Amino acid sequence: MLETRCKYYKDEAMFHGFIPHIMGTRFDILLIHSDAERLNGLWTHIINELERLDKILNRFDPHSEVFGINKHALQSYIQISKELEKILQLCQYYYENTFHLFDITLKDFSKIQIHDHQRISFMSPDISLDFGGFAKGY
């Protein structure tokens, strides 16, 4: 179970939500609104979304989609979710438009092949995906 903390500061109409460890980092959010109940509901939605994305993009979680890709994409084509395919295409766009400075691999994005029908493969044994710099802003 994910450890979370939150507190509503009535005098400031401010809500602070905190998750000490998700996606390899801590997560803090400040929300401003006078309706504490509404903010609590929004916080629950945010937690659920962060947990969902963590199950896709966390390269250290053996149950995540990216962990499986990093483990098997060199041996064969790996089927990926539609969302991960869109994320990879977006990351490829950033890679190409930043003169290769933005790179979600630990080596060289050009060694990833994104195939039709939501499939991916790696062309080199030293490639792995790391969304640490991307996932937090996604």
Q: What does each of the following model-derived ranges do?
A:
Residues M1-G132:
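A contiguous, well-ordered beta/alpha segment that forms the leading edge of an enzyme domain
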